[in-house]
């Protein structure tokens, strides 16, 4: 089915989603399956960047993922530790894969790595024991380290390092919300969290424990400029606080969390300098 027909069918089905059930067959089921297969192969993605740097979200693909939950019944998923099973609606990306299929895909998935069907993993990526949710896109030569999470529909660029325990938030609902986007050559420090549609631009570095949501203030300590929802290219961020407003009795109010841009580097410096050196004040 051509992409335009897929999009139209899925949009119409989503508008009438209350009528879509596990018993639904025919064109709607086929359209959703086709869309999930295209996502799984990386032939389409939930969001893509244009030449100007703007990201466009393909909402119809998010709708396809949401419709799949209505179309698919719960079932036993084998492969748990100690012979245990799971009970879910979404199969593993690796279901039925053998040596040839893994070699063709060209990425590394160590024991304990969980990837749900419709997520795409590009060549030379490395997945340590981690979780990649449905509809996500992980580009070439990216490392998803131990206990890191890539949320539903998140977009991860090339040569990104997502450190141990870091969380990249997912988004399926509300439908109008955009996914978290980590552009090429970024470093996300251990136990950091990027959520609520934040965009981390090319080459940025987040120190350990940086938390970014849609309303988190990102303060450039040199210029005083404040960013919200987007980390500038090649910015180096550490956790910080902003002074709170005085309370009614005149006492200092509680400080609020923010992220602080401690420096900015160019592409050449970023490529030649270790992360530890960049984060050293």
Swiss-Prot record:
The gene is dapD. GO terms for cellular component: cytoplasm. GO terms for biological process: diaminopimelate biosynthetic process; lysine biosynthetic process via diaminopimelate. HAMAP family: DapD. InterPro entries: DapD_Trfase_Hexpep_rpt_fam, Hexapep, THP_succinylTrfase_dom1, THP_succinylTrfase_N_sf, Trimer_LpxA-like_sf. Keywords: Acyltransferase, Amino-acid biosynthesis, Cytoplasm, Diaminopimelate biosynthesis, Lysine biosynthesis, Repeat, Transferase. Its main location: cytoplasm. It is found in: Cytoplasm. This is 2,3,4,5-tetrahydropyridine-2,6-dicarboxylate N-succinyltransferase. GO terms for molecular function: 2,3,4,5-tetrahydropyridine-2,6-dicarboxylate N-succinyltransferase activity; nucleotidyltransferase activity. Pfam families: Hexapep_2, THDPS_N_2. It catalyses: (S)-2,3,4,5-tetrahydrodipicolinate + succinyl-CoA + H2O = (S)-2-succinylamino-6-oxoheptanedioate + CoA. The lineage of its organism: Bacteria, Pseudomonadati, Pseudomonadota, Alphaproteobacteria, Hyphomicrobiales.
